[in-house]
Regions:
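Surface-exposed beta-loop interaction hotspot
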Residues: 47-123
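A short, exposed loop/beta-hairpin motif centered on an aromatic-Gly-Thr core
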Residues: 11-15, 145-150
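Short, compact, well-ordered microdomains
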Residues: 43-74, 150-188
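Extended amphipathic alpha-helical regions
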Residues: 120, 143-144, 153-157
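A short, structured beta-strand/loop element
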Residues: 125-138
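Short, basic/low-complexity N-terminal boundary segments at the transition from targeting/disordered tails
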Residues: 22-30, 34, 99-115, 152-154
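Polybasic, proline/glycine-rich intrinsically disordered low-complexity segments
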Residues: 182-204
């Protein structure tokens, strides 16, 4: 369709019926209609994550996403994980009445020593400089920079909250999560969406 209308290579998207697939198809169509030219090797940010374009066998461009399991990034065909994250992050922001403020997965966050690879309760807070991740059993010494992607593949629980705006604080522990923003607190104990999110980690 893109080739016939605009002389641009078609973009083949495998979405497996994932909600939001129509939005992604429309996004690429609208961009091409507005004069944007996509090429093999290019990455496109969707939500917090990146999609990567590659040459297909029939002259089209294919879409790949990170597998969210490997470091460095391993690209696999499809976009279902990226779209799922986009929907979850939008919905989390909707719970506090704010528009998403998407970072990029390649941006750094500050992490305390035992946060990555740990399973203890943690706090994540965002300011104008980015995200800070702190395990509750750390004293704050020895913090280091780590890409948000590396943080996310080790502690998937952070992913739904990454688009919260600066000023947000998330307190997470097994069985509960609480967001604090502008003096208001939103808890999984009283918020049905946050409660479902904790109960269904496969959503992430």
């Amino acid at each position: 369709m893109l080739r016939e209308k605009y002389g641009h290579p078609d973009i083949a998207i495998s979405v497996d019926g994932q909600p939001g697939s129509d939005w992604l198809i429309s996004y690429f169509s609208d961009q091409v209609r507005n004069g944007v030219s996509f090429k093999a090797g290019q990455t496109v940010q969707v939500g917090w994550a990146l999609l990567k374009l590659a040459d297909g066998d029939a002259g089209e461009l294919t879409v790949s996403e990170p597998d969210f399991a490997s470091m460095p990034v391993h690209w696999v065909g499809g976009s279902s994980r990226v779209m799922r994250h986009l929907i979850l992050q939008r919905e989390v922001c909707d719970q506090i009445g704010e528009e998403p403020c998407f970072p990029s997965m390649i941006q750094p966050g500050v992490v305390s020593p035992s946060f990555v690879g740990g399973r203890s309760a943690f706090t994540m807070s965002r300011d104008d400089e980015g995200w800070l991740f702190k395990a509750d059993d750390d004293d704050g010494e020895g913090a280091r920079l780590c890409s948000l992607y590396a943080v996310g593949i080790e502690r998937t629980a952070v992913i739904p909250f990454l688009a919260l705006p600066p000023g947000a604080v998330v307190e997470w522990k097994s069985g509960s999560a609480e967001i604090e923003f502008k003096g208001q607190r939103y808890s999984s104990q009283s918020n049905s969406f946050l409660d479902r999110l904790l109960a269904s980690p496969a959503l992430i």
